[in-house]
Amino acid sequence: MALRRLGAALLLLPLLAAVEETLMDSTTATAELGWMVHPPSGWEEVSGYDENMNTIRTYQVCNVFESSQNNWLRTKFIRRRGAHRIHVEMKFSVRDCSSIPSVPGSCKETFNLYYYEADFDSATKTFPNWMENPWVKVDTIAADESFSQVDLGGRVMKINTEVRSFGPVSRSGFYLAFQDYGGCMSLIAVRVFYRKCPRIIQNGAIFQETLSGAESTSLVAARGSCIANAEEVDVPIKLYCNGDGEWLVPIGRCMCKAGFEAVENGTVCRGCPSGTFKANQGDEACTHCPINSRTTSEGATNCVCRNGYYRADLDPLDMPCTTIPSAPQAVISSVNETSLMLEWTPPRDSGGREDLVYNIICKSCGSGRGACTRCGDNVQYAPRQLGLTEPRIYISDLLAHTQYTFEIQAVNGVTDQSPFSPQFASVNITTNQAAPSAVSIMHQVSRTVDSITLSWSQPDQPNGVILDYELQYYEKELSEYNATAIKSPTNTVTVQGLKAGAIYVFQVRARTVAGYGRYSGKMYFQTMTEAEYQTSIQEKLPLIIGSSAAGLVFLIAVVVIAIVCNRRGFERADSEYTDKLQHYTSGHMTPGMKIYIDPFTYEDPNEAVREFAKEIDISCVKIEQVIGAGEFGEVCSGHLKLPGKREIFVAIKTLKSGYTEKQRRDFLSEASIMGQFDHPNVIHLEGVVTKSTPVMIITEFMENGSLDSFLRQNDGQFTVIQLVGMLRGIAAGMKYLADMNYVHRDLAARNILVNSNLVCKVSDFGLSRFLEDDTSDPTYTSALGGKIPIRWTAPEAIQYRKFTSASDVWSYGIVMWEVMSYGERPYWDMTNQDVINAIEQDYRLPPPMDCPSALHQLMLDCWQKDRNHRPKFGQIVNTLDKMIRNPNSLKAMAPLSSGINLPLLDRTIPDYTSFNTVDEWLEAIKMGQYKESFANAGFTSFDVVSQMMMEDILRVGVTLAGHQKKILNSIQVMRAQMNQIQSVEGQPLARRPRATGRTKRCQPRDVTKKTCNSNDGKKKGMGKKKTDPGRGREIQGIFFKEDSHKESNDCSCGG
């Protein structure tokens, strides 16, 4: 503390004496001063002597024997010359009243000092008035020493010197006035001046003369300018000039910039001598160049590598220059039908670096002797084609009976700097077993005023099984960039929503496992005009009437059979039809609403990039360090400095070298998607770099990375309100995306990024569809020809690939669970198939540890099997807002239960709205034996029953574990149904028991076996407890429901 006070005191010590600028000095006058006096009998100008016996002009007054003296002396007009505070130095002598014989009591030994401001010399004999107002009094001046008769006789001079100041002054000038009211004195000298801080060199900066402030306590900030070859650091460099013209409080400093070192006590910045360099600004001295580098001139900021040696972009400047590696050695190939295993040994010379990796270049040489060409996009590489760290690779999906040449390149961090191609070893192989050819012709099957039905034949060379077709169309009068694309699993499609009488251009292409073939040639078809349509109706009217009579009986029979056989099957079929209808009508939105446009609908994807993403010049981007690796290349952090804007921290995704055109297109598609979004909870695209290498996507930088790993690193560190705030941000971002008609498909905590302010932003747009078939990553599982993250995906999306905003809501519920469990893996160590089975059997995840009931209820609402019953993202945002505004709603936690454990919730419960009384509801769920118990305990209405918890069920007298489970699950579903009627309001549902970890669960078991004793309710045959290696907590497996009609076999996990 003492050192801190000392430092503060040193900051306030003046650095250099003030400079005084004189405005008026009476001692320099060579003639009469000519000041105005009032009355004439008062002050008198006389010649006198100063303390050095120099002749000077003075004023004196001594009317002490006359009463009521009021003698004024006024100077001439004094211009202030920009000064804000004026100082007056007065030298005077005063006669001691007591030394004057017979002096009356009115004798004074003081006088008053006044000033008056004016814009010009306007004073007269009578103006300003000789009184205190309008004059402004500065002070009453008293003598420190006065002289007596003895002093006078001995010619002893006792001169007093007093300095007074006043301000602020703002007009062009001023007058001074001295008022005597009964003294005997002599005004020997008057000097009027102002002060300013002098020019000074301090902390490597030059500060020019600065006028002091208007008040004695004023501190006027002055900006310094750095000495030659120095730059400011930390904060703008400042000194403060006080009211007395003294420099105080130095802030900031200048340091020699890169390439210069400080000499002569820091007053000069000298360029680094030849053979030395200095990379950064600072006080440190220049250092010698590292190995294999040199400088060519003084003032070097880095040393240039010698010929044949290079420095990578991210290498520190003090690191020795290195070279490229030699070729790999001893390549071994093993062919198996259309797949290949390659192995090799590292090169002899790594170039002096430790970042050696390998790239695989595939060339297809066909069956003839023509030149080889790069392989197509259908070839698969495991683990990847570029940037291999191990000397082996597995290559699959090659063409049958085709000759290939594979080049194994050895590259390191300076390969891109070298003008020479990477060194490589090559191997030639021939496979033992491609995209389909173009569709040759398309036919019009039928048309109406707003639709056309088309069909086409299979490609002449399908080269495998046709998975589906993609049809693109646009109005002939419009540009091809306005094309709309739709997919069809068959070679027939009906295009709806067209204009009457308009001509449309159609093209189609087929897709196999090898990818899409080429589009067919452009074909033109026209919809009917209104007149043509009316004519066709009249021609078909007799046929329609005749057919209707014959078909009516058949239709009635079909309807009756359909209703009787399976009402639920009808509902499912209706839902699927609705899905198809939605697929064709989803593009019709409210006029004026911004709609997401799929970049893959553009024939030239580069056009989508140009339309939605801003091109950034590579010179504006500075890559600093690699922070990760993605599917297409490295992810780096760096800075972006656009002209006219401040420098910002950004994340940079780079496209690895050796990419194919398809990889480049897929890589930039994410930018085309992100560029359409502008929301605080959606990752912001700054722009792209496509006109230089490497190709880059530049986004805002999120300091805390992905949400799942961030939560795991900060387990238990946040309040519930903070976690709800994160969830609210994610929901707001998803609401924005849903309003734009964008379906994410891969919403998970790993795809949410977190910045330093804990703001969560949705990211990862479009890349999941391009994941390689890597069996080592169980997150994405093949399903119906695509990759699906099973644990986060809604059941209809898994089974039918029906991705909608409602399926994103299901995924959002999983994200909620991830957040509240601090990044636990959903469904723990269950297999993906076990997860699918459990969801189909209507079980759901339990609440994580310390999860409020209201939040788990919202999760359950998101996991409604019927997607139409799930809340919209707008409702979710409103619900979370209400929780944040009312924190008390988050205090109710799901309690632990010693008698029952229901980790996965049964959702197959009848709709309570179909019953009139609680008794009917109990009968419907086969719990009628408790009707009297419910009535006696006061649970006689659905509103009261919906609020029951486990302790209420126990108090009613339900002791059997299976019955507790049945009633509790039914109450939970009742709450969900109530929320669907009253809109989702985040009301608490079931409070779920938990184990010692974030959640509690039981081992899977064969539902056909009896695994517990019906007499004591204790579970037998359970697996041992497992320890989650990623979390270090004891957790138990998953509990699946048993046959609901076997009440005696309902079991629970141990407590």
UniProtKB/Swiss-Prot annotation:
Catalytic residues in the record: D746 (proton acceptor)
Chain span(s) of sequence motif PDZ-binding (in isoform 2): 984-986
Major site of localization recorded for this protein: membrane
Mutagenesis / variant outcome for changing K787R: No loss of ubiquitination by RNF186
Covalent cross-link (Glycyl lysine isopeptide (Lys-Gly) (interchain with G-Cter in ubiquitin)), residues: K891
Topology of the protein relative to the lipid bilayer: Single-pass type I membrane protein
Effect of V650A: In prostate cancer
Single Gene Ontology BP annotation: postsynaptic membrane assembly
Posttranslational mods: Autophosphorylated; ligand binding stimulates autophosphorylation on tyrosine residues. Polyubiquitinated; ligand binding stimulates ubiquitination. Ubiquitinated by RNF186 at Lys-891, mainly through 'Lys-27'-linked polyubiquitin chains. Ubiquitinated by CRL2(KLHDC2) E3 ligase complex.
Protein name: Ephrin type-B receptor 2
Taxonomic path: Eukaryota, Metazoa, Chordata, Craniata, Vertebrata
